UniProtKB/Swiss-Prot annotation:
Cofactor: Zn(2+)
Pfam families in alphabetical order: Peptidase_M23 (PF01551)
GO terms classed as biological process: proteolysis
InterPro entries found in the cross-reference section: Dup_hybrid_motif, Pept_M23A_Blytic, Peptidase_M23
Disulfide bridge map: C65-C111, C155-C168
Protein name: Beta-lytic metalloendopeptidase
Domain of life: Bacteria
Single GO term (MF): metal ion binding
Binding site for Zn(2+): H120, H122
Organism in which the protein naturally occurs: Lysobacter enzymogenes
Protein family (similarity comment): Belongs to the peptidase M23A family.
Amino acid sequence: SPNGLLQFPFPRGASWHVGGAHTNTGSGNYPMSSLDMSRGGGSNQNGNWVSASAAGGSFKRHSSCFAEIVHTGGWSTTYYHLMNIQYNTGANVSMNTAIANAPNTQAQALCNGGQSTGPHQHWSLKQNGSFYHLNGTYLSGYRITATGSSYDTNCSRFYLTKNGQNYCYGYYVNPGPN
């Protein structure tokens, strides 16, 4: 994705933990289209908002825990393990709009199945309907390098680069799209 298109999918100024890239299902190693992000807070996620990560979005509410936003240029972003989704299909949402909360319960997080080890959002990038490998993609001005296997947090294979500096998995503050 071009630099400036995407921001972290949590509110600007907030700090969330960003884990290693992985496939949408978590199995296999390609395309690593997804990131898990969490704010902490245990079983009370009511104040932890998930935000639209790109502009010009047409909202799709797939279920009570899964949403997608279709952006320009064939891009879309998906958000799983949600609760309290704020919009219905067809709504137009802009970048940084609060769309839902991270889930309070595992049952809510997994309303469409899968696995979860604690409250977090599962964010994915798609282009023309297919999951898109994040290696080389920009998110909040950070260029993602993801050359290992799913959930790999070894900083030689998964890291984010900004202004010539490499950053490993960990907490990031959302500066916006750049």
